[in-house]
């Protein structure tokens, strides 16, 4: 049996930093998963862990879900990729349009990064404007345009962006404070912003909730100034409710991005909106999007079965009940400490050293060293 340390020492020789994504890096080294089932991960040393990260988002229905596995096996018998349209991708698109608010047509892609990148291109093409507004701490994938004051792995590494991004790539990206409508309005009212892209709940800087009425004000500001609102539901979609944060907060985007959960553990994402908007995507329109694996039949099979399970009446009450049970327990244990705990169905975050977090600036003031210690101790206890 090889140890986690042995595998990490070898992986550093062949993989950048020993991992394929920086958020998987841990000190002194990560554990290497051998298999998973339900809520549990089992590493190569035989240690088991409860996966509260849900595979960083996709595994809402648990690892090795038997229904999804069966659906995938059935598709594998028919083929893995064709390079042609399939009837199943029509069914998948139709199902999404029936579930997701304000979506009539979609384009399937493979990752959340591809979805947000394509959504921004579409907004620019429609408005004939270049500028994009995002929010401090909001993470919309690993493409140049949005790696500005981002959350996720960028938040916990050395800098808030990345080397290798030309200044010209981000000169039209403006990042403003979340939950501050005046900061947003002062930029958008200039009339030259193509799109506002927003995580309705900023999940990659913890779990920063929008204040009451804030998202409606964001929508109003966008509409009044001819700016499209991109609702990035890659994380919140199908998590906080079947209709995502749009349904929860009663605010619809013009373009909606989806990912993570919709693939049931397989690479699958999408962006969508009203027909008037989506008809601008190639080949009908002049905004280009393409991909060899777009609508991959194996991913679509997993996605369709995932939607079947999510639409069952017991699914979301169960998710909310589990979230409440976990967060109630955390609150009981930390109520006498200086902490802030925020949650929505299927997601939560505990901040140390602060009592309120309403934006990225507040999140950065939290005691991240204490959080690292907390995380390390949880790993020792199999969490």
Residue ranges and their predicted role:
Residues 1-383:
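Conserved N-terminal phosphate-binding loop of PLP-dependent enzymes in the Aspartate aminotransferase
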